[in-house]
Amino acid sequence: MLTRFAPSPTGYLHVGNARTALVCWMYTRSQNGKFLLRFDDTDLQRSDVKHIDSIVQDLRWICIDWDVIFKQSERFKHYNEVFLQLITKGHIYACYETKEELDIKRKLQLKHGLPPVYDRSALLLTEQEKFCYEQEGRKPHFRFKLDRNEVVKWNDEVKGEINIATSSISDPVVKREDGIYTYMLPSVIDDVDFNVTHVIRGEDHVTNTAVQIQMIQALEAKVPVFAHLPLLHFDDSKISKRKGGLDIKSIKENEIEPMALASYLIKLGTSDPIEAYVNMQSLIDSFDIKKFGSASAQFNLSEIHKLNSKVLQQMPFEMVKERLSQIGVNSPEFWYFIRNNIEKFSEVAEWWQICKSNIEPVVLDKEFIKIVLDALPQGDCNENTLSEWVKAIQQTVDIKLKDLFMQLRLALTGAKTGPELAKLLIFIGKENIIARLKKY
């Protein structure tokens, strides 16, 4: 088995494409297959090497690896060879209409209630007429000639049986006037050459699939298995590169854990509940492409933030040991305590600083703080220190328990809320507690 993911490097990787990449990768890895990463960069003016680099980084960030990687721009010579073969066999033909002329044709067809399908008038041109057009300075674009008598059928892994009548489809342009190949033909040539067995992509490619099946047949190659995923929606609009904040770069900047995003994207739109997974293997083991429904799924960034907390709560110390070391935390006990109280990993450093550094405590009542200091139990802090301390304070001053805890937390941490104070005292330590209270 070989699947492929083929992004165009014209922008940052967005969540819709990331989901497709994850599904392709998990589908093949769940069956011990191979994964191919291809960059569709035939349009050299719009493609940018910086986007290739960023897509590679983003895919690695969400734990995707690959067995083969290449750029289509490295294969132009081969595309040209196949292109000429298809012209010779009558599968591709030259057209000379301008964009304006094609637009007029479409408008006339629609005006008369006809489908806006290309009329193949270029097939009627004589060699003399073609020569005259070229003398005018017109450069041809090229179309693939569809078999319009066929209803293309395939059994889709997600959508079931699909039937597309090619009589309702225009012969697709495969090469533009400027010599640039469109998406269609190079994609088919690559799939054939690399023996791609399964093509998984969004349902917006269903019509393209019917066209490409005929192209594959023209190359006398085996048609792969196809799967078309329902699209993701955000605020009732399709996810696209133009939707701000929905690229992987922005997701990372929001401090989302890779496994939180992967867990969400793989389960979104399936019959499985969306749950937190902390490693890819467990997610692969639960994967089944048949569980995807046919309806579009609503993408909700706030749900990913909730899932992020759950992923952090399940991470063992060994998984985050190196990251913790980078912020000066080497205590497994602190990690297992604090992981249940954070939404983002950066909060670990914040609470470590609160415990170990000089902070500015908030004091509402200086006299009360003197009483608190005098009532502090002897010995090192343990899980019983807080309860003993509170009892001693209440024996000295009449104060509501809620107010007592709030003032104590403010004086020791500078914050109104936070992790369980009884355990937090252990990590702050007796010396720091006394130093903070003595400031007042």
Swiss-Prot record:
InterPro entries: aa-tRNA-synth_I_cd-bd, aa-tRNA-synth_I_codon-bd_sub2, aa-tRNA-synth_I_CS, aa_tRNA-synth_I_cd-bd_sf, Glu-tRNA-ligase_bac/mito, Glu/Gln-tRNA-synth, Glu/Gln-tRNA-synth_Ib_cat-dom, GluQ/Sye
UniProt motif ('KMSKS' region) ranges: 238-242
Motif extent ('HIGH' region): 7-17
Subcellular location: Cytoplasm
SUPFAM superfamilies assigned: An anticodon-binding domain of class I aminoacyl-tRNA synthetases, Nucleotidylyl transferase
Pfam families: Anticodon_2 (PF19269), tRNA-synt_1c (PF00749)
Transmembrane feature ranges: none
Residues reported in the UniProt entry to bind ATP: K241
Biological processes annotated in GO: glutamyl-tRNA aminoacylation
Quaternary structure annotation from Swiss-Prot or TrEMBL: Monomer.
Name the record gives this protein: Glutamate--tRNA ligase 1
Species of provenance: Wolbachia sp. subsp. Brugia malayi (strain TRS)
Lineage: Bacteria, Pseudomonadati, Pseudomonadota, Alphaproteobacteria, Rickettsiales
This protein's encoding gene: gltX1
